[in-house]
Amino acid sequence: MISIGTDLVHISAFAEQLAQPGSSFMEVFSAGERRKANERQASRYAEHLAGRWAAKESFIKAWSQAIYGQPPVIAEEAVVWRDIEVRADAWGRVAIELAPELAAVVRESIGEFSSSLSISHDGDYAVATCVLTIQ
């Protein structure tokens, strides 16, 4: 079985959210994701993180689709977003890496799975698609 999730993020609105005084939104990103974003030019910082946010959302949507007709395994407000980490290899190809606890919960709900991820940016938008292949 294959399950697909896609998310679209408006980069300008996302940047405003990041810049709000007292915002804790950066906490949704892992230390590694924040470090990689800080390596970008200031003008591309929000763009980079918007793509990562879209990727995290696309994973949740793909997982949710995989359990269609069943109640959610984790309430939306209980998701620990930094447990869904977007990593890139030396050539910039991205992948989802789940914290061990979350990976166990996902496996318990859908069985063994693998994921594929794509992130793209165009103008003021970032989009990500996650495909879960369930064995």
Curated annotation (Swiss-Prot):
Q: Supply the SUPFAM superfamilies for this chain.
A: 4'-phosphopantetheinyl transferase
Q: List the InterPro entries hit by this protein, alphabetically.
A: 4-PPantetheinyl_Trfase_dom, 4-PPantetheinyl_Trfase_dom_sf, ACPS, Ppantetheine-prot_Trfase_dom
Q: Which residues form a coiled coil?
A: none
Spell out the Pfam families in the cross-references.
ACPS (PF01648)
For this protein, the Enzyme Commission number is: 2.7.8.7
EC category name: transferase
Query: Family per UniProt?
Result: Belongs to the P-Pant transferase superfamily. AcpS family.
Q: Which HAMAP family match?
A: AcpS
> What is known about what this protein does?
Transfers the 4'-phosphopantetheine moiety from coenzyme A to a Ser of acyl-carrier-protein.
State what protein this is by name: Holo-[acyl-carrier-protein] synthase
The record lists the lineage as: Bacteria, Bacillati, Actinomycetota, Actinomycetes, Mycobacteriales
